[in-house]
Structures are given as structure tokens and as C-alpha cells.
UniProtKB/Swiss-Prot annotation:
The record marks K113 as: Lowers pKa of active site Tyr. This is Aflatoxin B1 aldehyde reductase member 2. The active site is at Y85 (proton donor). The keyword Acetylation applies. With 4-nitrobenzaldehyde as substrate, it exhibits a substantially greater specific activity with NADPH than with NADH. Conversely, it has a 1.8-fold higher activity towards succinic semialdehyde with NADH than with NADPH. Residues 27-46 are annotated as: Disordered. The modification N6-acetyllysine is found at K136. The gene is Akr7a2. NADP(+) binds at residues 80, 179-180, 205, 234-244, 258, 326-334.
Amino acid sequence: MLRAVSRAVSRAAVRCAWRSGPSVARPLAMSRSPAPRAVSGAPLRPGTVLGTMEMGRRMDASASAATVRAFLERGLNELDTAFMYCDGQSESILGSLGLGLGSGDCTVKIATKANPWDGKSLKPDSVRSQLETSLKRLQCPRVDLFYLHAPDHGTPIVETLQACQQLHQEGKFVELGLSNYASWEVAEIYTLCKSNGWILPTVYQGMYNATTRQVETELLPCLRYFGLRFYAYNPLAGGLLTGKYRYEDKDGKQPEGRFFGNSWSETYRNRFWKEHHFEAIALVEKALKTTYGTSAPSMTSAALRWMYHHSQLQGTRGDAVILGMSSLEQLEQNLAATEEGPLEPAVVEAFNQAWNVVAHECPNYFR
């Protein structure tokens, strides 16, 4: 079964490549995901990246392959994983799909990350070990985008960056990315890389959604100044912005998900599971009903439309939203929402009011 699904995924990738035109040898610069075209002079919307954190956990290999196929068949082509996702199963599943990741003529782009957790570090040996292990799992010679997943405050950053430069020179990754770093750390890293002639970071992956906007104050201006594009994770606040939860649910038995039943559950509950967040969601839900009546979009749709049309993401700068999922149905619903138009002004204002309700306890974007 998996073999058949894998072949289907590979065929989808070929069709995607065909739509993109003949294959050509690429220089050492990453091809970005095709962003949605502007309609009638509207601003270019942010791109969409497939987040694969649940592959190997809530999604088995067959279900994972089906979601990748559905994603590619929409003409999208960037996949995001990490060394640590599901103890490496996410990378292994992606590597088993026969996509030809990392080859010169592959139009499907892959990103992974090295982290400083669970006995790992960002010391040179650990960075190399993590990346080379990821390449083996992904069955590819190089990744298109290699992130430092979070700061390692016990390792001098210059050592980490030197290691990244060496790995880049060896052809093991194309672009360097940062995630969960403070804005001052981004400035320090960029300056160090530039002064030493090392590969410059070009992408930052950070937490951003309609009720988690801390990045707007300092980080986004920093990224604009240094020319990094921004990829937003947690666009639905781990699922809280779907509106399917109630604050009292934390005290009862819940099905497995971001907030319950896994090693990251406590982190996500500490991040988003707060009374003010539920009050903020109620404000938006009321505005949706008042504004749209019986044709009101779902809370999920509204939250994603806010990201694509009303946030500070800019498609012209190559910004993107990372869409995760725990099923094919969920992915298809989320992708449909990304193609919908802007929200009515009253709902946008309700989202602003919601942000004001939770701003005082917004989780930090850095670690």
C-alpha cells in the first residue's frame, strides 16, 4: 500500500515539475515556493509550506504520503521537517517517498533543523552529526534549507556558524535559516557571517498568529532590515484558533493532539492554554456570527485568512505560512482556507481586539 502511495506522490512531484517548466541545473540558491498570484492588483499573498511534525506520530507512513501528494498537486513544493520530529520518523517517511529530494532537478524543496535539546547541542560535531543523520533519513545529498532550531546558549555562536559554513561548502545544504532566536541574536549572527564571509541566514521561522503577535514589534523590522524572509509556524496557535476547545477541557480526558497526549503537550498548554486566549476567541466567534450570519466561515478559516491577508507577512518578500496537519482532511480544509479572500473589516477589528486581550501574556517568540 505504502509503495503504491509513494509512486503516486512521485508522479505528483513530476507533474509539479512539468508545470514549472523544464528542469535546469540550479545554482546554490534555493527556489522558493510559488506564491499565490495577485488577483486584480491585490497584494501578493504569502506562500505555503507543509509542516510535517505529526508524520510518524498521529499520521502513519501511508497517511503522510497522501498528504504530501495532495500538497504537491496544488502546485506547492516546500516541505518542512526537523531532526527531532517524532524521533526522526518524520524525516524517514519523507525520505521513503521517492521524491528525489536534494537532487539538481527536483522541484520539491526540503528544510530540516538541528537542535540543542535532549543531549544535543549546536557545537560543531553535533551540528554535523544531526545534519548528516537527517540527510540519510531523507535519502538526499543535501537539503535546500538548514535551520538552527533554537539558540544553544552554552556554545559560542561563532563555533556554530563556522560549522555551518563548512557544511555549506561541502554542499550539504543550500540556505541557512534561524528559528526561535531573539532579534538581537539575528543581528549578531548576520553581522558575524557577513564580516567573516560565511553563508548568510536568509530565512527565519517563528511563532506568529492572530493572537500571538510579539514578532511584529522588533523581530519583523529586524528581518526586513537584514533581508530575511519570515516563515510563520503555529498559525492556528497549536489548534486553539480552530475554536474546538474550551478552557475547562484541560481538566478532562482529551484525545491525543498538540495539547494532550504527547511530550510537547505541556509546552503547548503553557504557551496558549490561558483563559484570556479563550475570551479572545469568543470575541472573534461573535464577530463572525454578527458579520456573516448563517454563512459565517469557521474559526479556522478566519484565523488562516487573517494570516494571509491581514497580518504583516508579505508575499513580495517571500514570507510564508507553515501549515501542519494531523490528517488529509484537515490539510485539505486548511489549504482551502488559504485560497479564500480577505475578511470583513469588522472581523479584522475583532481580531485586533482579541490581540489586545491576550497581548500581556503573549508567549515569547525566542527561547
